[in-house]
């Protein structure tokens, strides 16, 4: 799958996750499934395209109920929702369960 297609998929799943969370609650099976699916696609993006993406601490984590990382893009990408510099947030705990410590260090240590 192409880089841009993965980003579009992450955006679509993120929107669906937010709707499910608002309609059914954050503990709903569909909400949890969508959140996990989004995180899995974000992990795929970072693994398949490490030259075009990286992790950064989310600057707006204080507005959420858990610590978040931002999946950032080296260059902005034109998407169906406009120009994007990121591929949404990933909860820190999800990133820590999907990546090894070595991978986390690799995806954080980018000279951008």
Region spans (language model):
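Short amphipathic alpha-helical heptad-repeat segments
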Residues: 2-17, 37, 50
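Intrinsic structural disorder/low-complexity segments
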Residues: 8-9, 18-21, 45, 75
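Acidic, low-complexity, intrinsically disordered interaction modules
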Residues: 32-101
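Charged, low-complexity interaction regions
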Residues: 19-32, 54
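Short acidic DE-rich linear segments
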Residues: 102-112
């Amino acid at each position: 799958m192409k880089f841009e297609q993965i980003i579009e998929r992450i955006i679509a799943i993120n929107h669906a996750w937010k709707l499910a969370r608002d309609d059914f609650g954050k503990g709903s099976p569909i909400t949890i499934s969508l959140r996990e699916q989004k995180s899995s696609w974000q992990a795929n993006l970072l693994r398949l395209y490490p030259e075009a993406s990286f992790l950064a601490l989310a600057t707006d984590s204080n507005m959420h109920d858990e610590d978040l990382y931002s999946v950032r893009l080296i260059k902005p990408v034109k998407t169906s929702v406009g120009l994007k510099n990121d591929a949404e947030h990933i909860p820190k705990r999800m990133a820590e369960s999907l990546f090894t410590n070595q991978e986390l260090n690799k995806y954080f240590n980018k000279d951008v």
